[in-house]
């Protein structure tokens, strides 16, 4: 019965055009459409399509900041030596995409366009201005340089032109005109046998989200974004790919392990779960069709929790009531959280024990297999926990990855115990007090007072200059 209901609703959705956002552009020939500059100002599309625009704008209501490091100080140790040890908040609404990347301590406090710790690539999932710059400068031109170079250019929050070809005839006629606005995402989909232009509508819906909600790394001297899917999308496939090219995001400052940092692999984990395998898309659950005050259907662009629109999302397929499904999801979330903490405890000990081994005179040859185990354990843990919705998208895969991470961490600690014994160290390696974020940051040598002061100065002096320049150049509304 549930499957028939889903088919009926999907057939219904085919009858009515996808009311995403239609174009303000006049009708164009295919040739002229190719040369139209990407329009990054989202409010441009508001007059003709107020429902979609207002629902997108309502992502600003998702304003709460949740400090993941304060909630779980172990993370500071696992990311010692990496900017994530300074600052890591859980995600919030798309309307804060640009604000949050400016304000995070991870992007530093650059004074000039050539200053700062991070590359231009760190803008790549934040704004339709990225698509505009890639169109204007080419990929190599866009990726060239430091993150601060993009400050006066990337000023509009993630929105219309990130997902829709707003200059196309289809879009002007009210069709969704979905597009992959990032060429590197298009290449990645082709690498896994999913060329976008040959994909069906439902596949395209999730592929558009998969431009950003994926694992990626910065490749080559230009630090260009690349998805590590050449060997496949499972955690072991990506691990093998990274190992083969000898890639690491950073070296943990305690254990000296060459580490991998997972990003937000929702597309990969969704693909591995029951929803992905049955082609229930991101849109089905997070952007359902809803009615406006006049009873007209439109796609809700306030991307959020499916339970907030239960009748339009979960109830399309499931016969259980909302409370029953919430109970199931909560149990899965708790199971993943419990195993996550156990793995983190093992990894924290492993990093400090590895430091003790180095301090005791361990050699590179002695440490290599141990560091490899730590690298693989933390990578598998990170890919599981960096996908914030894994308890819903693929709980079985999440538990499998965490179980594998636990095994690898145990292997590392067993080898460390044996190695330390050869150095005359048989007692347990004590841990410093890492019971709070502040204490953990102090334990790895971070001067947070200075880091925060520099950031505040940057926000007060540099960011206003960026915005003034953007307005003068017509990139921001006055």
Curated annotation (Swiss-Prot):
State the UniProt keywords alphabetically: Calcium, Electron transport, Heme, Iron, Metal-binding, Oxidoreductase, Periplasm, Signal, Transport
GO cellular component terms listed in the entry, alphabetical order: outer membrane-bounded periplasmic space
Pathway assigned in UniProt: Nitrogen metabolism; nitrate reduction (assimilation)
Q: Which residues bind Ca(2+)?
A: 215-216, 261, 263
Q: How is the cofactor bound?
A: Binds 1 Ca(2+) ion per monomer.
Q: Which cofactor does it need?
A: Ca(2+); heme c
Which BP terms from GO are recorded?
anaerobic electron transport chain; nitrate assimilation
Task: List positions binding heme c 5.
Answer: 275, 314, 317-318
- List the PROSITE patterns: MULTIHEME_CYTC
Q: What does this protein do?
A: Catalyzes the reduction of nitrite to ammonia, consuming six electrons in the process.
In its UniProt entry, what is this protein called?
Cytochrome c-552
């Amino acid at each position: 019965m549930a499957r028939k209901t889903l088919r009926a609703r999907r057939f219904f959705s085919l009858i009515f055009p996808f009311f995403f956002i239609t174009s303000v552009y006049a009708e164009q020939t295919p040739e002229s459409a190719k040369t139209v500059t990407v329009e990054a100002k989202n409010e441009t599309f508001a007059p003709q399509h107020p429902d979609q625009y207002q629902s997108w704008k309502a992502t600003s209501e998702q304003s709460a900041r949740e400090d993941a490091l304060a909630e779980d100080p172990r993370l500071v140790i696992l990311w010692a030596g990496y900017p994530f040890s300074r600052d890591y908040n859980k995600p919030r609404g798309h309307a804060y995409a640009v604000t949050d990347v400016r304000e995070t301590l991870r992007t530093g406090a650059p004074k000039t366009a050539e200053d700062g710790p991070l590359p231009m690539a760190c803008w790549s999932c934040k704004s339709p201005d990225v698509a505009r710059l890639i169109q204007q400068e080419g990929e190599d031109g866009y990726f060239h340089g430091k993150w601060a170079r993009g400050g006066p250019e990337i000023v509009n929050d993630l929105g219309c032109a990130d997902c829709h070809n707003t200059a196309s005839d289809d879009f002007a006629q009210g069709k969704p005109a979905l597009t992959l606005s990032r060429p590197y995402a298009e290449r990645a989909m082709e690498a896994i046998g999913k060329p976008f232009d040959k994909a069906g509508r439902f596949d395209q819906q999730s592929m558009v989200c998969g431009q950003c909600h994926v694992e990626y790394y910065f490749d080559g001297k230009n630090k260009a974004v690349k998805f590590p899917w050449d060997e496949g999308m499972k955690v072991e496939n990506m691990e093998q790919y990274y190992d083969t090219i000898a890639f690491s995001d950073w070296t943990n400052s305690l254990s000296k392990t060459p580490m991998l940092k997972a990003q937000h692999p929702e597309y990969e984990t969704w693909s591995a779960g029951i929803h992905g395998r049955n082609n229930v898309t991101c849109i089905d659950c997070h952007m359902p069709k809803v009615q406006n005050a006049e009873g007209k259907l439109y796609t809700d662009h306030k991307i959020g929790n499916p339970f907030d629109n239960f009748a339009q999302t979960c109830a399309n397929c499931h016969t259980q009531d909302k409370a029953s499904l919430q109970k199931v999801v909560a149990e899965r979330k708790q199971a993943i959280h419990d195993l996550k903490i156990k793995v983190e405890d093992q990894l924290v000990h492993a990093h400090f024990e590895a430091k003790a081994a180095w301090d005791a005179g361990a050699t590179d040859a002695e440490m290599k297999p141990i560091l490899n185990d730590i690298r693989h354990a933390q990578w598998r843990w990170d890919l599981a926990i960096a996908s914030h919705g894994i308890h819903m998208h693929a709980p079985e895969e999440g538990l499998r990855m965490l179980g594998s991470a636990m095994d690898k961490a145990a292997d590392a600690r067993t080898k460390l115990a044996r190695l330390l014994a050869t150095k005359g160290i048989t007692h347990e390696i004590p841990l410093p007090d890492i019971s709070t974020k502040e204490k953990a940051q102090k334990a790895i040598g971070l001067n947070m007072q200075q880091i925060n002061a520099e950031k505040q100065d940057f926000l007060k002096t540099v960011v206003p200059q960026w915005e003034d320049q953007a307005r003068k150049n017509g990139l921001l509304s006055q």
